[in-house]
């Protein structure tokens, strides 16, 4: 009979579970070949009964906060290393570090829209300081100070100077559109926020999710059909600096440069619905929809800034 190698020990992923949530890609690269079977050793190379190999994912605990993006991130890495080891030959000189660089460069193929990488000249992807704007018939253009050309359009809102800053002044009917979809993790999104009137509003919205503020003044993320709330109340009529940091493991909130909370899964229990996975692809399509307040100094980085750097940025100091 013919065999396809889908070895459980090496090739099986189990998203969100304590047993191999993420397949050990480095171990596979360094120790596995298509003729390796964990339970029975190996077979001879070029054995005509061995047809090849597959990787597998058992993703059956969606209620724990697992989204299609979580599965995609894991499966993409599994499939890439399997392809390298199955079809890439046996180049003994290639190191895992070299393979990793090649993977990051190639990663997803053309037309794979789950990936949300934004081309940028530097790690600063987007910078709306609202200093350089131009009014027109179709709204006010806000120019991207990051130099990437991701200019935004303000509809039914104004840009005003207050407290030495230029603010996007929203009255509940206006918004800002960017022409972008989302920024993938790792990322850092930082902005100044002033709530004039509490109410449910979407601060950042798009196909991949939503960062909103509730009538209680608390920020919350919506991803797939999950809603997770940060336990911090944004004060009314007071400016605060908000920083959201997203990685493959966690979504963090900083206020005025100080760490407040991390949304993350802290238990392996499959019935704990209070601590969900919290990977959050940050939406950038529409800003301020339904919000009655002001936003200033919006910056988006395609990396997770360190706590020290976040503190400096919140104080208005230049960061790289």
Per-region residue spans from a language model:
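Extracellular glycan-associated modules
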Residues: 118-150, 156, 160-320
